[in-house]
Swiss-Prot record:
This is Pescadillo homolog. InterPro entries: BRCT_dom (IPR001357), BRCT_dom_sf (IPR036420), PES (IPR010613). One of its GO terms (cellular component) is preribosome, large subunit precursor. The lineage of its organism: Eukaryota, Metazoa, Chordata, Craniata, Vertebrata. It comes from Xenopus tropicalis. Residues 291-303, 452-483 have a biased composition (Acidic residues). Component of the PeBoW complex, which is required for maturation of 28S and 5.8S ribosomal RNAs and formation of the 60S ribosome.
Amino acid sequence: MGGLEKKKYERGSATNYITRNKARKKLQLSLPDFRRLCILKGIYPHEPKHKKKVNKGSTAPRTFYLLKDIKFLLHEPIVGKFREYKVFVRRLRKAYGKREWDAVDRIRDNKPAYKLDHIIKERYPTFIDAVRDLDDALSMCFLFSTFPRTGKCHVQTIQLCRRLSVEFLNYVIASRSLRKVFLSIKGIYYQADILGQTVTWITPYAFSHDHPTDVDYRVMATFTEFYTTLLGFVNFRLYQTLNLQYPPKLDYFSEADLKSDNEDKYALETEAYMEKLAALSASLSRVIPSEPEEENEVDEFPADPENAGQEEEQKKQLQEEEKHKSMFVGLKFFLNREVPRDALAFIIRSFGGEVSWDASVCIGATYNSANPSITHHIVDRPSIQTQIINRYYLQPQWVFDCVNARMLLPVEDYFPGVLLPPHLSPFVQEKEGDYIPPEKLRLMALQKGENPEDDDDDDEEDDEDEEEDDEDEDDEENEEEEEDKKLRHLENKKVGQNKLNVRITAGKVKVEDRTQAAEQEKTEEKRLAIMMMKKKEKYLYNKIMFGKKRKVREANKLALKRKAHDESVKVERKKKAKKH
């Protein structure tokens, strides 16, 4: 009494997926256009659980998409624009072939264009969703903004990425939302806290580009097209939250400070204003002029005895956050021409410091190197011939390490020509059992307010004691030999004279150690619990314990390596000291 029997592969998972070629034919698009549409709409291929069933018994490698995603793409208005663009190219080619130049101009003026606004609203229903997804957008825009003007990508795209990335950096400076910085081989990693969301991006170093041949720039350009639209929306909303004008404009007083007679030498009139914004040395103008900022005070409510500790901890955390934001307030920096100006200017301004450089390096210098109010001079040279007394001359790493340490570090380790301490990653969070390098322990001691120099002095004293012990070893050995001879002589005399003395003493009550007994009881309970486990649970438990033990072994191995390295350094130091 049942219905018609369905054929094989006409039900179940086989009907939920569709191959890429079938999807492309259904949408009537070429492969590049289909790929472009999927990138813009956020449609990705899926790997079926039972690939052979979906592939109708075949084992040939194929790309599969969900059928519901392809049906969703059928109603996309951009698909029609892609078809219009095909017709546009065909008509333009035909007009070129006939040498009808008036027709060429007319067709070019009517080039089909589309907007991605509706896709942005569709993919990100709320503004926080868009902020949460900024990581890749920022990394791609910062990468494209550094590209040279070659045939690999459009000049307009490069200029747009440059403008949007500069706008975003100015927002981070105005909101003081930067939290972490790390110099890696790939580039400079930044992490900011934007509206409660953690945003991490990477910017490449300012080196000349050698475009690799194995990279598909069309795919990258499609991603960039979407990301620039997204970043434009986000920048506009972020500027509104801070009451800043958008597009950004320099403050009247800041603009007056940045005016120089030699602007024409560095940039054209059309580019000079953008270069001033990109210098990041001036503040932005607001829609309503801001009043002098007052210190934000935390609201105090009647104390709740249950959550008193938690409230106190939150209050302390907020105070530390505010202190971190204003770490460089009151400090004036001057950057030498050999240091990475863009990164340092951005970081210093993000924490409330003032920064400038030589006027011949770039537009945007606010004071020169002779200014007596400069507190820190950032240089990257082994030695400086003429130094001014009332300022510190430091290597650039000091700025980056201060940001990650959330405090101003001692300057002695960063003087010009000094061997720098290791640049530790702020993104690594050590857990229980992990290896912690001595430099990190020293930094943690500094953050707690302790003085790690005392430990260093103790180590030096130990080294000196070891040296003295090495010198006195020979004398001690001779004295020990003489004492041994005397003892043997006395023992020979006393042989036979000693008698066995037996004493009876009162017994003592052995006091039971309660903590030790509790520990023994706990270990016994744990052992019994392990015995009562099921086979599957026991296997999982053993796996977890094996992982923990392996972690401890690796940490011990690293500690031994570090100890051997430190000992070899000490030996070399002693050899050098003896030579001198």
